[in-house]
Amino acid sequence: MKKTQQKEIENVTNITGVRQIELWRRDDLQHPRLDEVAEEVPVALVYNGISHVVMMASPKDLEYFALGFSLSEGIIESPRDIFGMDVVPSCNGLEVQIELSSRRFMGLKERRRALAGRTGCGVCGVEQLNDIGKPVQPLPFTQTFDLNKLDDALRHLNDFQPVGQLTGCTHAAAWMLPSGELVGGHEDVGRHVALDKLLGRRSQEGESWQQGAVLVSSRASYEMVQKSAMCGVEILFAVSAATTLAVEVAERCNLTLVGFCKPGRATVYTHPQRLSN
């Protein structure tokens, strides 16, 4: 491949998280063609100079990811606990260098653990089995949601996946207003990372969690429920199914969990009192 062409591809990658590679189609194995593939890179979150976790993620909106992860894992209580943040290249991927308040950093050091993440990581940030499903502060019951508004949101969820439309390789997480309008959506090769990006962005912008719900394009794992509850989200809609542990955690923390969300269809696992038809 010519150097100029490679440089153009690298520039596209930097902007979109997409790279062009050569591949072969089943009906023509003799002639390669260029096609778009989603990028997946190791991203290290480094707090006050100490690497805390490495996750596989799309190289976009990493400041939102770092903020959302810090909130949903209980490392910080609010965006004010972070004094500064920089995304820098490292030898094998990217680092998000985070300047944490002294008080929160002391708490982090007490629970620090080494973790190598994966795209489908289901226990990210968990140190031992006893920590899985640890209850969070029970959520209040402050809102209701009309399920008739869900269908329109489902039709537009793909709008927040430009990389996914090119590659078929990303998950999306978006905030759904009571009207069914989707706002503030994010995508990533990792479903948990997409959710953290959404949580981080809305927290950074000071948006309320009391009027609306989270909609994700993936299944609902225990960690998706716990992350949502940690940030005050009362309702979580998932396009696919929920796991048993996700249902148990949602029940304990008063989160309304809904799966199998398709036009005209939804399965409510917990706390249906927030929903109406």
From Swiss-Prot:
User: Which of this chain's residues are annotated to bind Mo-bis(molybdopterin guanine dinucleotide)?
Assistant: 260-265
Keyword Chloroplast on entry? no
Record GO terms (molecular function): sulfur carrier activity; sulfurtransferase activity
Gene Ontology BP annotations: Mo-molybdopterin cofactor biosynthetic process
Listed GO cellular component terms?
Answer: cytoplasm
What subcellular locations does the record give? Cytoplasm
Q: Which InterPro entries match?
A: Cytidine_deaminase-like, FdhD
Which UniProt key words apply to this protein?
Cytoplasm, Molybdenum cofactor biosynthesis
Active-site residues from the entry? 121 (cysteine persulfide intermediate)
Origin: domain of life: Bacteria
| Record has Oxidoreductase as a keyword | no
Family, similarity comment: Belongs to the FdhD family.
State the protein's purpose. Required for formate dehydrogenase (FDH) activity. Acts as a sulfur carrier protein that transfers sulfur from IscS to the molybdenum cofactor prior to its insertion into FDH.
Q: What is this protein called?
A: Sulfur carrier protein FdhD
Organism, per UniProt? Escherichia coli O1:K1 / APEC
